[in-house]
Structure formats: C-alpha cells, structure tokens
Amino acid sequence: MKNQLKHFLLFAVLVVLGTVTAVAQATLKGKVMDAETHEPLIGATVMVKGSAEGTVTDTDGNFTLKVKDGKVMLVFSYVGYNELSRNVKAVGRNVDLGTIALNS
C-alpha cells in the first residue's frame, strides 16, 4: 500500500511540473512603424512563423504577443510594405523588441 502511495505521489508531482513547464510563456511587445516617415502602422500583422500565433498592431503601432519560451521567428507585414523577419529569443516574462521599421 505504501509503495502504491509513493508511486501515485510521484506521478502527481510529475504531472504538476509538466503542466507548469508547458505553460511557460513570454510576452513580446514592440512598435511597428514606417521606416521613412516614422508613422505608426495601424493593423500591421505580427506572426510567429510556422504557427497560427499572431496579432495586429493597435492605433499607435504597438503590439503584444504571448509565445512559448524559446526561440521564435516573427514575421512583420503590412500591405504595400516589404515583409520583415526577425529571430527572437523569448525567455522570461516581458521582452521589448523596441521599434520595428518596415520599408515600403
């Protein structure tokens, strides 16, 4: 009986630790602007390459995106502008990418 209890407790601890690891996330934030005019690009798309994760910028060109911890490639795009890809190491709670400038 004691042996079964030990196995059950070990299993429960592993499940809890696995769940905590699975939900480890970083929040990426930044601003997408026109490279020449420095105007914010409203509704620019920010996507994680190879996934359905993404967001669009707000009226000030700002975005926030939650991703799993690790390396990701972000793709920034806007109609009439050249697409820009950027590798990001997403580790920790908040990662500020600063200003992303797109060329038309």
Show which residues each predicted segment covers.
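Periplasm-facing N-terminal accessory domains of Gram-negative outer-membrane beta-barrel systems
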Residues: 22-104
